[in-house]
Amino acid sequence: TYYNIAVSHARTTMKNHFRADYSCYHVIDYDTITGQVLKKNTHQGLAHESAWARGQAWALYGYTMCYRETKLPEFLEQAKKVEQYLFTHKNMPEDLIPYWDFDAPGIPNEPRDASAATVIASALYELSQYDRKNSERYKKNADRIVENLTNSYRTTLNKDNGFLLLHSTGTKPTNVEVDVPIVYADYYFIEALLRKDKLEKTGKLF
C-alpha cells in the first residue's frame, strides 16, 4: 500500500540520511538495483558533511508529520532528537533565525535563512501537541521565531513584490537566491501563524 511505502521510505531515510548527532545530509545517492548507498551529499549547504539549515528544518517538520500520520513512536523520537540538535547547536543565533548553514565559516557574518526558521516554527507548534513533557518549550521557541521574523525580517507593505519576509537563502554555494524573499518562506510563515492562532484559541491543531 502507499502507507507501507511511505513508512518504509521514512525508515530508510532515518537510517541513511542522518549522522550520529541527528544532523542530516541533503541527498543520498542509491544504487537503483541493490538499494546500496553510493554517496551522501549536501548540495545546497556548505559541504557534504555540513548541516544545511533548511535541510535540518525539513527533517524536524517531516518526522513530526510522519508521527502525525502513523503514530509510530520511532518517528516522534526522531523529531525530538532533531529538535535537540537544532536548539543546542552552538551556532544557533540568539534570535533563532538560522544562518544558511550551521557550519558556515563566516558566522556571525553569514546570510540567514528565514525560510528555515519558518519551517522550524511551524513544526514546533505541531510537535508541542505530541510531546507534552517539552510542549511549553517548543511553543516558546516557536513564538520567539515568529516574533523575531515579524519584527526584524518582515517586508515593507506594498514593496518587495508582495512577499512577506526578507532574508532567505536558497542556494548559497552557487549564489542563487541569497538574502532574498522566497515564496516558501512566506508559506510556512503563514502556516506557523495560523497554527499559533489555533493553539491559542482552541489548545489543539487537529
Regions found by a protein language model. Give the residues of each.
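Glycan-recognition and catalytic cores of secretory/periplasmic carbohydrate-active enzymes
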Residues: 1-206
